[in-house]
């Protein structure tokens, strides 16, 4: 389960049966767009040995690490996360710098307080957009009538998150005009930090795609 937007402050996936949770710590956990990072959290409850053909990397000897079989050596509680740290981090080099880890730790200290305000701000903005004559649709699980409203309140009783998606009448041209007239929001390709960020993928990160390709990409 990718819990980046909800964060542990709002959603506890392990309590609902998730086995592994991932986070882009660059987002709300850091909170200030100051450090790149990611996290994998293993519940230690999944039985990898029940599916040896699907998970040979955990259930058969690792020749690159003295022939260790992770499930045998570290048990179900440690097999996956040990492989991640011992082998995958070694091969991919995804080790956070001490300075980035320090900045992330600072961000984590205020996470619950920031998320509470992010959710309140997003709720107010979503409700305003929902009632605006130039807004065609709004997707935000905190709005009554949203198809995920009940699920959001079940799994995220403290709030959803601060990310909203909405569309304007007039299509791409109207969206680009809206972006050019922002006064408080910053035009970025980053989301989920202490700043008010506004993204329009069709004219930025996905601008090389034609109409059909944009539709296929969601």
Model-derived features with residue positions:
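Conserved PLP-enzyme active-site core in the AAT-like
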Residues: 1-132, 139
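Conserved C-terminal alpha-helix-loop-beta "cap" of PLP-dependent enzymes
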Residues: 115, 134-218
């Amino acid at each position: 389960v990718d819990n980046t937007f909800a964060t542990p402050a709002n959603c506890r996936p392990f309590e609902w049966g998730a086995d592994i949770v991932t986070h882009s710590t660059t987002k709300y956990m850091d909170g200030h767009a100051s450090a790149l990072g990611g996290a994998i959290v293993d519940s230690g409850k999944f039985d990898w040995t029940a599916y040896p053909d699907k998970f040979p990397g955990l259930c058969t000897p690792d020749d690159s690490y003295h022939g260790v079989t992770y499930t045998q050596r570290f048990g179900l509680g440690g097999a996956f996360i040990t492989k991640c740290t011992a082998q995958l981090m070694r091969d991919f080099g995804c080790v956070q710098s001490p300075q980035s880890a320090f900045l992330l730790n600072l961000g984590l200290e205020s996470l619950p307080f920031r998320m509470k305000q992010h959710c309140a701000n997003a709720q107010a903005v979503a409700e305003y957009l929902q009632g605006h004559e130039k807004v065609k649709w709004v997707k935000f699980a905190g709005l009554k009538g949203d198809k995920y409203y009940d699920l959001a309140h079940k799994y995220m009783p403290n709030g959803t998150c601060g990310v909203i998606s909405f569309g304007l009448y007039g299509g791409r041209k109207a969206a680009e005009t809206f972006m050019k007239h922002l006064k408080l929001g910053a035009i970025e390709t980053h989301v989920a930090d202490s700043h008010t960020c506004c993204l329009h993928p069709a004219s930025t990160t996905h601008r090389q795609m034609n109409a059909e390709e944009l539709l296929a990409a969601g």
